[in-house]
Amino acid sequence: MGVETIFFAVMSSLFSLVQMLSSPSDPLKALEEQTKGQMIDSKDNQENIPLIYGLQRVPVNIVYMVTAGDSNNDLHLVGVIGEGEINGIHQVDGVDHIWLNDKLYTEYGSLVSYTVYTGTSTQTANADLVAATAGMGLDAWNDPLRNTAYIYMRLRYDRDKWQGVPNITVEVEGLKVLDTRTSTTGYSANPALCAYD
């Protein structure tokens, strides 16, 4: 056996040992490591609300979900996008960039309806959701989520389209920032203006 072969065998063994010792023993941490960098929406009403600057595709955090309608065929979702006021959802050729499991919402036709709230201080609770959940007691929705950008979405059940709650991501034109050159506030993807904010 040559010196190179012995050196390679020793280094491979050391690398394997270091990798084994540094890998997380907690299965939750292992899953967290595997999904790091992927856009997966969360479902946690205690999650921090992100600040979004410039143009970014981000997952929503579903903070409210309830079924209603005939035979509970409608799934109503409220997904927080970020702290407002944002400029809105980015459009290409007049189509909002909203994805459900990496497909544009338009591929689902009438099974999807939504309203985007940009996070103004005067926005009101979604009237369709308030009406759909009226009479549900503590589960009824009436929160306007002021100063929080969010999306209200209704998904109509179709077993050929949905195998579960879809992963929802949106392409957002982020927070409005002050342009110190003109003393105006508006959307900008200029990194210097975003950093100044």
Task: Label each residue range with its predicted role.
Residues 2-197:
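Polar, S/T/G-rich
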